[in-house]
Curated annotation (Swiss-Prot):
UniProt similarity note: Belongs to the ATP phosphoribosyltransferase family. Long subfamily.
Entry protein name: ATP phosphoribosyltransferase
NCBIfam families associated with the record: hisG (TIGR00070), HisG_C-term (TIGR03455)
Notes on how activity is controlled: Feedback inhibited by histidine.
Top-level class of the enzyme under EC nomenclature: transferase
Amino acid sequence: MIHNNRLRIVMQKNWKLSSDSKDLLVRCGIKINLCKQKLIAFSENMPIDVMCVRDDDIPGLIMDGIVDIGIIGENVLEEEVLSRKLRLDSVDYIKLKRLDFGVCRLSLAVPIDKEYTDIYCLNNSRIATSYPHLLKKYFDKKNIIFKSCMLNGSVEVAPRAGLSDAICDLVSTGATLEANGLREVQIIFRSKACLICKTGNISVEKQNVINTLMTRIQGVIKARESKYIMLHAPIKKLEEVIDLLHGAERPTILKLAGDDSRVAMHMVSSETLFWETMEKLKLLGASSILVLPIEKMME
């Protein structure tokens, strides 16, 4: 049983966002036993219950006020918003934060041998998709007439099977399109995972848990975006070294025993440190360069 005084979080049960969502909760310090056989799991150390459902059920559970918070892809969220508007259902929700996973794009793709110059080549075409409302919204803005072929899976096989002239589907790397003789021609929607919350009254107790959770999520994301850097640098080149590294704050500078010409520098870099940057540091005389991952971070 889910208790009303506990924060209710809903997330995808299977597929792409499931493992990343679980990892986020674990990194936020939420002790919870999630498994495929259980639809509901209860946190051992926080007043939080987690429901695992189909991804396209998540927006409705939030907008109908059944659960408090959801982790969902923006593509699924926007498609459901458009669908619910047509049905005159409530579409109230608050987007708390875009997350750092679930990156993809909804794109149009055509057979490799199909002549294509611009989007208007698809006028009066039949297009297979799992996102008919997002597709219609995009084509309506372009005043393009089309016929929709609704498929809930294996959209990429539709042209080869003679079901459609083109497809509109999610793309991550493009490898699946290429394997099915298709090429991406137009991005119509860019998506990431996001954290959404229901509107309406939320108890003080639940709001406190939400605030704690948001602080921890921000810390997890910030830590994943940052690296802890330690190196030795010549004092004369110190400012040039610092300029190469974009830090959250000014670095910590320490004297080196028995060497007055060099110092040790420690800092949190807010950007990924590429090999090219490390090579530039080396040219400035830096040595003993260490780049370490950060597990948790709070500013």
